[in-house]
Amino acid sequence: MSLERIVERLETEKRTKIEEIKNKKEKEFQEFVAKKEKELEEWKEKQKRSLKEKLNREENTLAAQLKLKYNAEKLRIESDAIAKVKNLVLERLKSSSNEVYNKIWENLLERESIKSGEMILTKNEDKIDVDYFCKKYSLTLSKDRMEGNGGFVIQKDNLVIDLTVDTIIEELVNKNILEIAQILHGER
């Protein structure tokens, strides 16, 4: 074999080997790039899911906070409305005639079956016919006065019957709270 042919054959083998190595490295590079692109896409998806979950949690937290603020404000408004109702009842009671006013207390004393005891008036009470009630129900009038918007307390031994305007209005509201709530919510 001639030297030229050997060189030519070696050149051909060299080019073939170079081409094989080049193709192999190109394939490895393409596989590496594909693997890294896949990892990048998986990482992006994971970050998207994580961000979406975080946003959902923050949205839920914000919604819960807003609902809590709304309910607190609603409760404050309802409480104010109930306080206004109580004040209106108190004003109506105070502005009623002496006859009507005393009839209310007489009905309350009858309901409680009062037969004797000590009557303690509130500081603001000035419409009750004390002499009439003391005589009819065998009550003694205390020199002391107590806090309140009207009415009185009857004490006998260990028994205390609170017939103050504040207590009666509070009991009236509590007894009718469901109906009041329905009115406040526009259900009636």
From Swiss-Prot:
Database matches in Gene3D superfamilies: ATP synthase, E subunit, C-terminal
SUPFAM superfamilies tied to this protein: V-type ATPase subunit E-like
Keyword flag Ion transport: yes
The keyword Ion transport is assigned to this record: yes
GO CC terms in record: proton-transporting two-sector ATPase complex, catalytic domain
Function of the protein: Produces ATP from ADP in the presence of a proton gradient across the membrane.
Protein name: V-type proton ATPase subunit E
UniProt organism field: Dictyoglomus thermophilum (strain ATCC 35947 / DSM 3960 / H-6-12)
